[in-house]
């Protein structure tokens, strides 16, 4: 009996105990509890998400140089829909997006135009701060070798005219309008003949002929804003007359325009004037002149551009349609201006 009892006790260790419903097996004496509970710590001032957002923003800007036009378009759309509230970030956005004015894809250029409009509406005056680089790319687009890029160039110019002042670039933009429309600034008979027959020029393709309507509309807008907008003196007189100050007080205040005395050339080398016997401005002197005041712009228009523009616009008036109407509007503006 004693032997059988010992055998049963030894076999207990190798038998699986049958547990009742709801009962758990008894834990051995040498059991060690290895379970643990995790707790999260929230720090309101932690910058983990901010760093991640900055990295994501930088990555998006880098995708603007992606080889796929679809990717570039989607990135521009995403940036347009999620513009930051911090104005400091707009410098990076404009610097990265403005080169896409020369993008080969028309869809990308359209989205860049929408981006510039959104920036202008959300941050007034911001496009005016970056107008120098934007104008450079617009001028490059106006003289680009691809017709599609030339056709959309004036649309960017119209957007910039809405939110910025382009008086300093009056001459450059007009000269590139002549190139865009295949007009000539020369006086010889050969150039006049070419300037009249604009339909036979190499730069005008089928799509470009349709785009001339947009070009002329923007030209009308450009001329009105730079030649007919004489509100500077009127606003000053109106404001100061309301508060009953001396009429000449505004002359002794800080100028409202940047580099107001640039025309005096106080810090530059004196350049000999190339005026003709009648006192008109020479073409060679255009690049050295500042055009912030309306008198200078009117003199430049009357001496250099007016007669040649009217000559070429009359050729467009003969075509009729919308092109003829816009050309006729330009002629009315040019014939109505006078030196003040």
UniProtKB/Swiss-Prot annotation:
The keyword rRNA processing applies. One of its GO terms (cellular component) is cytosol. It comes from the Eukaryota. Keywords: Nucleus, Ribosome biogenesis, rRNA processing. GO terms for molecular function: chromatin binding. Disulfide bonds: none annotated. It is found in: Nucleus. GO terms for biological process: maturation of LSU-rRNA from tricistronic rRNA transcript (SSU-rRNA, 5.8S rRNA, LSU-rRNA); pre-replicative complex assembly involved in nuclear cell cycle DNA replication; regulation of DNA-templated DNA replication initiation; ribosomal large subunit assembly. Pfam families: Ipi1_N. PANTHER family: REGULATOR OF MICROTUBULE DYNAMICS PROTEIN, TESTIS-EXPRESSED PROTEIN 10. Belongs to the IPI1/TEX10 family. Component of the RIX1 complex required for processing of ITS2 sequences from 35S pre-rRNA. This is Pre-rRNA-processing protein IPI1.
